[in-house]
Amino acid sequence: MRVGIVLGTEPISPLEFWIGVEEGQVVQLDDVLYVESLVGSQRVKYYGIVNEVHKFLEGAEFVYDAHLVSKGVIPVNVAYVAKVNMTRIEPEVFAPPSPGDAVYRARGKEFEKALYYDQMKEKIPAGVDRNGNVVYVNYNFINGVEGAHVSISGMSGIATKTSYALFLLYSILEKAGDRDRVHGIIFNVKGKDLLWLDKKNKTLDEESRRVYEAMGLRAEPFRNVKFYVQPSNHDPHTPDCERLDRNVSPFYWSIREFAEEGLIRFMFTEGEEGVSNIHYVIDRVANKLYALAQNSPPGRLLDEFSRDIESLSDLENRLEEAIRDKEQNKSSELYRSWFGDAQTQTAYAFFRRFSRACMHVGRLIRESSSPPRWEENRLSVVDISGLHSIGKMFVVGSILKKVFREKENIGKPYPKVFVVLDELNKYAPKEGWSPIKDVVLDIAERGRSLGVILIGAQQTASEVEKRVVANSALKVLGRMDSSEVLGKEYEYLTGNFRQRAIMLKKGTMILYQPDIPNPMIVRFPKPAWATRYSEVEEEVHVPEDFGNF
């Protein structure tokens, strides 16, 4: 459909030009247009996205003239113009189109060419644009073939970061060619909202259903989901949540696993970076526990006196015993075996922090083991919402470390694991230290080749370790704070996108991917899965022998 012509009143370049919109046509921001022009003897097509739209009066000189025009006193024309930024030129002849060339709205194959969809070997639905056209992302830039990782930023409660992360993961699990060899791990950090992802959302509206249909996705909940929740204080075999069925299991680690896998390192939160001696003691104790585990019978953890260590409380007693032995005997070998050459005050500083952490992690360490097993289901949801920040650090670090180690041992990208982690600025902060920062960095820098893909979300990308953000091929932005969006982390926001980022509504995101030189505005539908118990659609079960009546 023709919408206007290339204007000759403004300079025309191969990278941008202005168009005059024809009467009766509507052109808005983000519309995808194209021009076919004769350059020499060659037909060249210029594809682009509208990034500015203006209307003004031609022939009017004074501000008050607008009032006179509205009354019909002064005859003037209303100019309707738009600026188009190029996304693609076919063939690549970098000469400008000519004034007066017709401008058309890109649809069908022309729309796909404008956004390079025709060159994407595998594409995944990522939402729709303002005109209802499906917006795709190049899956090879997510799954590790050409790039990996997704970074989602935006204000808390308004930017719908988690909602978009879930939608993107759902699209991957439904449409990716390798979906049968893909697993997802979601860390639920706020409330119990994600414990119903396998249930239909009774509040899903018809408009959202149409958007799902347009993208070729089923408006259905996630399938083959396992939920892992911290154990109850009263019964370690009962999850601490209101949902109790066979799809929900408590998770915890054995004290033997705790020792073998060095999980004690994840009990020490941010704020220890200024106490270098603490890290020395942490490493000494971790190495001591590993040595004890190697010399203990299977399934047990014995100390140097062949006494069982069955809980963190037992371990706490052994550490205190070693410190007290040092106070009575300056050349204590027991103390040295646990704390090395550390001063007693450093050992006490470690012990105080360890004792505090035990209060928040204690119920997760038991004699037996029941850790999350991501490989058994397509999607695993690990609920850490009820844990203290120390407990959250411990669980996230322990799981990610094990996943990464298992993938290293496999040495192949399949099966691939997509990890959805919110509040990334807490786990991989730009400044300071966190116990799992190195693990997240390993995933960001080496996860691509191992098939461990991070879908990270944070309020402010400026507070996340820059190597994590830089290694994310796909960048998504929800509504942002006006000061944050000026940071260099958002340099991909060209034109007026920084200004638009502070005005985005819920369900609308800015999407940037390597294939397309310009960012794009996308809308995504409301979740087809319940995000809280009140949204769960009741299931009606009909007995098999009902038809016999």
Question: Where do the model's predicted regions map?
Answer:
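Basic- and hydrophobic-enriched, low-structure N-terminal and domain-boundary segments
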Residues: 1-155, 168-171, 175-181, 413-415, ...
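Glycine-rich phosphate-binding loop of nucleotide-binding enzymes
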Residues: 126-226, 437, 466, 511, ...
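Conserved beta-strand position immediately N-terminal to the Walker
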Residues: 150-151, 382, 455
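Substrate-engagement module of ASCE P-loop NTPases
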Residues: 171-175, 212-218, 402-408, 439-455
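Conserved ATP-driven motor cores of ASCE-family P-loop NTPases powering translocation/secretion/packaging/pilus
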Residues: 442-528
